[in-house]
């Protein structure tokens, strides 16, 4: 065996040993270690995000064992990241926030993932570089402290693992892999990716969401894992499903999607698209076209195929219990499997008219009926390829979270779950508002080990900016002193002394190291106005 072959075989064996570690006990890979090694370069690169990924895994493992959650929110900038570091264990980077405030094209917009694909990775880098800087700054400051000062000054872990929004992957499988590579290089400990179609992606709390087939999303998850393996990192991947509220799907090619695709049960109707094309040719527009589509949908009596089979069996005289058994039996089967079961096991004589092509939209999408059962079905399919599962929801209903957790854990015991504590919900209107404080921890008991408010950084920024601007316009510096400076002092916010927070002492230390310990141009020397904050006012 040549030395090159021997080196290749040795690296393959090393990867195989790596995959047998507890870290990957739940992970399924449809490729071999040799596939991975053959796609690596000859220079081994160590990525800081790998350290962060391992840290995140250890953190969530402890929470899973204890039935507790790690909760966080979406950070906008280095200021928020350093404040979060004092109290929270992780940092979230939101695609929604990046779309509105940090697009790499500098063109803001809603959360449609129509910004350049490097937008969120760039925001991750922005925040991760700040984390690294403040970690260095703290270490230098502590090196100058006495033993007593060290004992009385808590260490802040600025290197909180970052989990970032990968949207739908921004394209095909190689686009997903390139996006994953960017996230690893920029410092993300983990990413999440959703099962929507790229060109029609919407915020999870918008209408008009279009799903991709189950296998297509599994391929994305596998692509992410393969990219991680090629880079030799243990970063995490969160599989999100938007199927709870989805109404469309791109294709019926995957048998596992069949039970949730709707079809017309009215054989007298022509296909919807034909009707709409004819109406447009007649000069119909806007509300007129919408009324025509609404009328067609109503007349079509859209049903899921198991429902259509159940009605047909009932019409043939089957008992209610027999019909219920049929529905239970075919509820997760493909169209052809469901027909075979209905005929052979339940004696169905006539397969009912049910046409899933007739209601297709002008874009060619199939009508889809989402819901919690659908989300459980998809999540269970994604579980072998992901570290955490996340069901996007319309409302934060604890009973629904329990149903989802139970449905997943019945198939995948101990599977880690994630939960979006979304600001898109009007929390004050919810029935469990009296248990608001307990909500996060109740979810933790169900296995939702990682939870996050996607846009809390945006909303907290908006709140204080609006409040301060209103009052500053009326009362001038009185507003700044009362709303900002005094409050910073009261809560111990270190940005009160913003020169020190920004690293001026650290920069002086660098300069003095170069010049032998003396500098007449030190930023924090005599004359710096920040010394006023050490005086009694």
Curated annotation (Swiss-Prot):
Chain sites annotated for binding Mg(2+): 165
UniProt source species: Coprinopsis cinerea
Name of the protein in question: Isocitrate lyase
Single GO MF descriptor: isocitrate lyase activity
Assembly with partners or alone: Homotetramer.
GO cellular component: glyoxysome
Main location: other
Pathway: Carbohydrate metabolism; glyoxylate cycle; (S)-malate from isocitrate: step 1/2
InterPro entries hit by this protein: ICL/PEPM (IPR039556), Isocitrate_lyase (IPR006254), Isocitrate_lyase_ph_CS (IPR018523), Pyrv/PenolPyrv_kinase-like_dom (IPR015813), Pyrv_kinase-like_dom_sf (IPR040442)
Stored CDD domains: ICL_PEPM (cd00377)
Enzyme class: lyase
Sequence positions that bind substrate: 94-96, 204-205, 240, 420-424, 454
């Amino acid at each position: 065996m040549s030395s090159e072959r021997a080196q290749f075989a040795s690296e393959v064996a090393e990867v195989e040993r790596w995959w047998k570690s507890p870290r990957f006990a739940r992970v399924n890979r449809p490729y071999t270690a040799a596939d991975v090694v053959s796609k690596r370069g000859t220079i081994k690169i160590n990525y800081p995000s790998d350290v962060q990924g391992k840290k995140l895994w250890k953190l969530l493992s402890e929470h899973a064992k204890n039935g507790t959650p790690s909760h966080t929110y979406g950070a906008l900038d280095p200021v928020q990241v350093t404040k979060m570091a004092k109290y929270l264990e992780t940092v979230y980077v939101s695609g929604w926030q990046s779309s509105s405030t940090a697009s790499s094209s500098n063109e803001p917009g809603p959360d449609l993932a129509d910004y350049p694909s490097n937008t969120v990775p760039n925001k991750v880098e922005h925040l991760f570089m700040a984390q690294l800087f403040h970690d260095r700054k703290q270490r230098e400051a502590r090196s100058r402290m006495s033993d007593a000062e060290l004992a009385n000054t808590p260490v802040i872990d600025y290197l909180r693992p970052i989990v970032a929004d990968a949207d739908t992957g921004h394209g095909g499988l190689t686009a997903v892999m390139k996006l994953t590579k960017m996230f690893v290089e920029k410092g993300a400990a983990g990413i999440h990716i959703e099962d929507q179609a790229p060109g029609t992606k919407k915020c999870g709390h918008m209408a008009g969401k279009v799903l991709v087939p189950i296998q297509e999303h599994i391929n994305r998850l596998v692509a992410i894992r393969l990219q991680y393996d090629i880079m030799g990192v243990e970063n995490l991947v969160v599989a999100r499903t938007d199927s709870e509220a989805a109404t469309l799907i791109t294709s019926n090619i995957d048998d596992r999607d069949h039970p949730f695709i709707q079809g017309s049960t009215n054989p007298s109707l022509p296909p919807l698209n034909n009707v709409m094309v004819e109406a447009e040719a007649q000069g119909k527009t806007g509300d007129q076209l919408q009324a025509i589509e609404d009328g067609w949908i109503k007349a079509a009596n859209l049903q899921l195929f198991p429902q259509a089979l159940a009605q047909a069996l009932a019409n043939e005289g089957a008992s209610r219990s027999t019909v219920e058994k049929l529905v239970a039996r075919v509820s997760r089967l493909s169209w052809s499997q469901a027909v075979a079961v209905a005929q052979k096991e339940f004696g169905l004589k006539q397969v009912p008219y049910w046409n899933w092509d007739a209601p297709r939209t002008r874009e060619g999408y199939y009508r889809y009926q989402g819901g919690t059962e659908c989300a459980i079905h998809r999540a269970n399919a994604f579980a072998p390829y992901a570290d955490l599962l996340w069901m996007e929801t319309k409302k934060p209903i604890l009973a629904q979270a329990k149903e989802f957790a139970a449905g997943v854990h019945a198939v995948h015991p101990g599977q880690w779950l994630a939960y979006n504590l979304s600001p898109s919900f009007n929390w004050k209107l919810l029935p469990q508002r009296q248990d608001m404080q307990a909500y996060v921890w109740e979810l933790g008991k169900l296995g939702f080990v990682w939870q996050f408010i996607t846009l809390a950084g945006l909303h907290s920024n908006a709140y204080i900016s609006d409040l301060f601007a209103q009052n500053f316009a009326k009362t001038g510096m009185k507003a700044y002193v009362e709303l900002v400076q005094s409050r910073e002092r009261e809560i111990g916010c270190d940005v009160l002394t913003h020169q020190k927070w920004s690293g001026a002492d650290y920069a002086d230390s660098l300069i003095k190291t170069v010049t032998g310990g003396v500098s007449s141009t030190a930023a924090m020397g005599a004359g710096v106005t920040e010394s006023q904050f050490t005086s009694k006012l």
